[in-house]
């Protein structure tokens, strides 16, 4: 039962996140007057297909991928390679739309700003999905909306003895701006010792509180844990507070993804902690065992992760395509297609290698009880 629940939850999460991403590209291309030859959801053999409005809509067997085929996007060889990567049959490389039914212009003939919108629309839709889901969660499932204003400090707590006071509004921790309570907790969790520098608003003035210290306790695993030692005020569940909490929570998710990447590059986090598809599926399965709310929150994390990751300036990603378009706008001619293909292939191989390494980490943790 647990395995079945994990599979169903994973298909739901991955299917929703990828479908929304591809729909963003598709909708932007259509609105920009670009010919979309195929909009496919899923990978593998086609279960259903229909041509309407100059586009073939395809539903494929495995609901864990998607594809938007625009007229003139890349060379025939690169298009065939992309389709192979997305698990689509070689026969699909042929244009399914007869010339007299095509309603748009080829992708390269569209204005640069329109092509940029098409590339950015996929990640943007991931952020939109995350925001909509967060609004629903905050409005209906989240027990309480918390503020950043300290309500009380535990009696004898070190944080109260070293600077914090009831009524303080926490603005930043260790120089990093905090928008929601989770920002505060995240920054404290990243602290290497048991003290942190706070910026608070007290009586209308900003104050710097360096070296605020926290009590510690020993966890069940024998590790040292930080005891926060204070509580914050709750906010009324008004429409405005729900929207603000949803926006700030999405910023929080985006921020921890960026911060995790930076920590990885700076060596603060070991590359051995990198997790791949197996780890993600395992996390979704754990969330499913706790309930629907946890699965939905996992969906938010994954969709925001996909949005942020795809905007990175890496040639194999949407962000890399945006960089190529930016260069084209500056030099007033397209970047060499061969150069684009070579850079895309090189970074795709690198990303694929990282995924294999992360999957290896996941499998090791799975068999050693780390997942």
Labelled PLM ranges:
Residues 4, 78-114, 118-121, 125-274, ...:
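PDZ peptide-recognition modules
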Residues 5-13, 301, 348-354:
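Alpha-helical transmembrane segments of integral membrane proteins
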Residues 291-308:
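Small-residue-enriched transmembrane helix starts and helix-helix packing motifs
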Residues 40, 65, 240-266, 278-281, ...:
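Membrane-interacting alpha-helical segments
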Residues 357-371:
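Juxtamembrane boundary at the C-terminal end of a transmembrane helix
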Residues 47-51, 149-153, 326-342, 369:
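Membrane interface segments of multi-pass transport proteins and intramembrane proteases
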Residues 263-267, 303-317:
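Transmembrane alpha-helix interface/packing and boundary motifs in multi-pass membrane proteins
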Residues 3-95, 312-331:
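Small-residue-rich helix-interface/hinge motifs
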């Amino acid at each position: 039962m647990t395995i079945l629940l994990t599979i169903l939850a994973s298909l739901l999460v991955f299917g929703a996140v990828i479908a929304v991403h591809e729909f963003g590209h598709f909708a932007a291309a259509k609105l920009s007057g670009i010919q979309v030859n195929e909009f496919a959801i899923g990978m593998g053999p086609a279960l259903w297909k229909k041509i309407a409005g100059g586009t073939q809509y395809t539903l494929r067997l495995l609901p864990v991928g998607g594809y938007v085929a625009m007229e003139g996007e890349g060379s025939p060889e690169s298009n065939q390679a992309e389709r192979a990567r997305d698990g689509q049959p070689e026969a699909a490389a042929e244009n399914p739309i007869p010339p007299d039914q095509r309603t748009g212009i080829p992708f390269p003939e569209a204005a640069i700003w329109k092509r940029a919108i098409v590339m950015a629309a996929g990640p943007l839709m991931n952020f939109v999905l995350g925001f909509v889901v967060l609004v629903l969660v905050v409005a209906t499932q989240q027990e309480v909306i918390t503020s950043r204003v300290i309500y009380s400090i535990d009696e004898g707590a070190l944080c109260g003895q070293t600077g914090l006071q009831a009524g303080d509004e926490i603005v930043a921790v260790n120089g990093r701006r905090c928008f929601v309570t989770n920002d505060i907790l995240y920054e404290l969790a990243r602290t290497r010792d048991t003290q942190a520098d706070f910026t608070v608003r007290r009586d209308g003035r900003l104050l710097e509180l360096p070296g605020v210290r926290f009590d510690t306790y020993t966890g069940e695993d024998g590790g040292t844990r930080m005891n926060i030692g204070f509580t914050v005020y709750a906010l009324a569940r008004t429409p405005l507070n729900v929207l603000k909490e949803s926006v700030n929570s999405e910023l929080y998710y985006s921020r921890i993804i960026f911060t995790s990447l930076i920590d990885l590059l700076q060596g603060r986090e070991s590359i051995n902690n990198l997790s791949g598809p197996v780890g993600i599926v395992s996390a979704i399965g754990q969330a499913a065992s706790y309930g629907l709310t946890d699965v939905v929150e996992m969906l938010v994390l994954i969709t925001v992760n996909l949005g942020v990751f795809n905007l990175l300036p890496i040639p194999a990603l949407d962000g890399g395509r945006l960089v190529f378009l930016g260069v084209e706008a500056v030099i007033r001619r397209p970047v060499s297609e061969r150069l684009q293909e070579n850079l895309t292939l090189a970074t795709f191989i690198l990303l694929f290698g990282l995924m294999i390494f992360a999957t290896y980490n996941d499998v090791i943790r799975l068999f050693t009880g780390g997942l």
